[in-house]
């Protein structure tokens, strides 16, 4: 943590540690050293799945593990850096910082602590982060890792908190729900009997005002503007606000399960052809 903090301060021009050249030295040298390790590993038949700023994700056969380990130890002696090793049974990667990694031992123990998630697949609520529906990554993880159908996970969940989303709007926006103005920070879930949640701001023009503008090589253009500019905060479904928790049974909440299923399946369909099995 201390090293990460220093690295950030080296590129902060308002910090006394500011040193752009040192940042480039650290990052370029680090990348070149990792590239050297990656090159050595590919020469013995390893496949580099991911190369990040601080490590490599490598796919290899058990028969060449000792050879790969020897290369890593030689690299440590040469660079005076230390490598840490984690073994995985499977990895499902959507983007560079969005993945599910199943650590060695999960298949036998089913210990949830052996599932490592990052980015969009994190199922825990993080302070300071916007709230997204945690049932979606949970359903995706159970589908890939345990073979449980997405519909079973989503429709079998009885915790309304896992369906909740939230959005905070800036001071220039007003929030409107069912023709009533709301607070700027709202918590809601997709429902079949709710209305749309809108945010709007003043455009600076009068209702029906004609605005003219010019484009190069095009004749003068004009359009009619409105006093307010509206944006739908969840276009794919109506919502129900839940800024205050209550004891209503989940069966009575009219959850739009199709919305959550669609969002989960959308990710699965993109991810499935690129999944990596490491057994």
Regions found by a protein language model. Give the residues of each.
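Short, well-ordered alpha-helical packing segments
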Residues: 4, 31-38, 57, 68-76, ...
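Helix-rich, typically C-terminal accessory recognition domains appended to large enzymatic cores
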Residues: 40-41, 50
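Glycine-centered loop/turn motif at secondary-structure junctions
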Residues: 45-47, 79-80
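Short beta-strand
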Residues: 47-52, 85
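A generic structural motif
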Residues: 54-60
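C-terminal, non-catalytic extensions of nucleic-acid polymerases
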Residues: 65-279
């Amino acid at each position: 943590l201390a090293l990460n903090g220093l690295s950030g301060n080296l590129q902060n021009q308002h910090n006394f540690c500011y040193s752009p050249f040192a940042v480039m030295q650290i990052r370029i040298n680090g990348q070149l050293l990792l590239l050297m390790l990656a090159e050595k590993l590919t020469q013995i038949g390893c496949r580099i799945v991911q190369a990040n700023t601080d490590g490599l994700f490598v796919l290899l056969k058990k028969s060449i593990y000792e050879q790969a380990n020897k290369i890593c130890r030689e690299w440590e002696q040469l660079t005076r850096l230390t490598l840490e090793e984690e073994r995985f049974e499977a990895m499902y990667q959507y983007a560079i910082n969005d993945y599910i990694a199943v650590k060695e031992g999960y298949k036998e123990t089913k210990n949830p602590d052996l599932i490592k998630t990052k980015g969009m697949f994190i199922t825990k609520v993080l302070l300071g982060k916007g709230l997204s529906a945690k049932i979606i990554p949970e359903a995706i993880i159970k589908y890939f890792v345990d073979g449980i159908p997405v519909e079973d996970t989503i429709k079998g969940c009885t915790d309304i908190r896992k369906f909740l989303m939230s959005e905070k709007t800036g001071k220039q926006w007003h929030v409107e729900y069912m023709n009533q103005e709301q607070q700027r920070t709202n918590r809601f879930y997709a429902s079949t009997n709710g209305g749309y949640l809108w945010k709007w701001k003043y455009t600076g023009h009068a209702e029906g005002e004609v605005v003219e503008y010019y484009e190069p090589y095009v004749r003068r253009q004009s359009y009619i503007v409105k006093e307010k500019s509206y944006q739908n905060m969840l276009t794919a479904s109506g919502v129900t606000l839940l800024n205050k928790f209550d004891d209503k049974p989940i069966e009575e909440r009219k959850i739009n399960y199709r919305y959550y299923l669609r969002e989960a399946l959308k990710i699965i369909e993109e991810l499935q052809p690129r999944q990596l099995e490491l057994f």
